[in-house]
Amino acid sequence: MLHFDNAVSAELLLELASHAPDTLRWAIRYSKLFERTASPLWLALRAALVGGEWQVFFGVCDRLLDQLKPFDELIGNAEKQLEHLSLLELIAYLSVLAYQAFAEDAPDDRSGQQWQVYNRIILRKLRACPEQDFRLNESRLGQSLKRHLSPVIFPESSTADAARCRENLEWLAVLIAATQERIDYEGSIDWFCFDPECRYQLKPGELVIYNQSEAGTERWQRTGRKSDLLWHYWMSRAVQAFVNSGLAEQMIGSPENHELNQLAYIKAMRSELQLQQIYGLGHRRSLSNGTQVQLHHVLLASELTSVFFQSQFIQPFQDYLRESGVLAHALGRLAMDGMLSGENRFPMTWSEEEEKIRRIKGWTVSEEHPRGSADSAKAILRFWTSDLSALSQQLLKQQPGMPAPRLYEQPFYKIGRYSFQFPWVGAQQNNLTAAINNLRRVNARRADVQAETQRVELALAESLRQRGFAVEVGYRPPVTEEDDAGEVDLICQRDGVLLLMEVKSGYIRSTTHEVWLHR
């Protein structure tokens, strides 16, 4: 309730403070009320609660927010220096710096922090974009790349152009670093808000927040180990399904890419198994415009895209970087090789919709369409595409319940008539997580979600029956004047033991805040 200023009165909260102060303090932490410093509720509580424990609590909240101010100043200053860049130009510079992650001495980024930073920078840019940034045609595309990308990767560019681009890259590096620092510190605030082991204090020379025990950390690590074991389980099932299908005895694609293509097929089968058995999806996906596409083709396209970007972009770039030791030179050689072979090997790729469909079509071969299906390819492109103009409008309107897609969740980005991709995302993204979050986070309001959840409940019920349980699915206790218990997903009984199960089938969460909301 504390997310909304008009959901509860300050008087009621003050009454709660007098009887259960710890409960109210946890409610403030869970709701992050203290981040809304101008909230009438927050101001009323601060004015009325003057006891020592409350003053320490308010002081800790202030200290946590004060730490964000230097980062916000750096971010604001860097954005001001870069505001003359169009959306396309900013993305071009981001794509250059993104390749630093593929250097041999680059630190591991297992949590995807780099993508979080780039995602936030792009979303903030989308909130400030003029409409003309989305009216992209061939002329404007060429002019922008000539002024802002060519001088970086081709050394024969003029000195003035190169100096201007170097200055833009330097300011963007400042923006990236400051945004990274802010996101890191937001993790500390989430720790304070959602970790039941987190305690706080205001003592000179001591940390403001600390853990009473390591139970929360150990629980998080244990969950990670479970996730790793489940990954191996589903991959093992997919390998067996791949062998049973007869594909293991066939050449897939060119001989040099055969092993990578095999792995792509196995991963697609793994994802299909999980989506069907855990998330209740069928063999075909219905899109919002009524078109349908095979789920396997949707998943296979993303896996083969990763193979393509890894083999044609990342590996050659790393070879060139080892030779020259200079990021720009390596990117220039990669781009030049592409031009000599008639291919786009720039740090980001783009083409019009028909060209994208033509390339994807070959991945939709089936008995029904032995040469592939253009309609299926178009549906796949639609499924994986984020329309940045529409997203900009959504962000400006601040529509509740409409989450913005993350970079990897919809890795085709529509600007004007062009579809863009980032090889530095596509080559290393987790395509299963991308598919799940596309379906269950970005498109959580799909009409099919309820039917999918019912399939999960029925499949789980059947599995339990095979193990000797008596199972009732979807039981609704009678509604009384005093109470409405709602639906009980599964009631299971065996050997005198009764289990009441609530089936939850959401998206893949990556932060303590998201996990807490799920619970």
Language-model features: locations:
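A short acidic/basic microdomain associated with nuclease active sites
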Residues: E462-D483
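Short acidic, glycine/proline-rich loop/turn micro-motifs
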Residues: T511-W516
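Residue-level detector of functional hotspots within protein domains
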Residues: R455, R476, D489
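Anion-binding and metal-coordination hotspots
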Residues: D483-G486, V503-S505
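Short acidic loop-to-beta-strand element that houses the catalytic metal-binding Asp/Glu
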Residues: A485-Q493
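Active-site beta-strand-loop-beta-strand hairpin of nuclease catalytic cores
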Residues: C492-S510
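Acidic, metal-dependent phosphodiester-chemistry machinery of nucleic-acid enzymes
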Residues: M1-A451, L458, E462, Q466
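Nucleic-acid nuclease catalytic cores
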Residues: R519
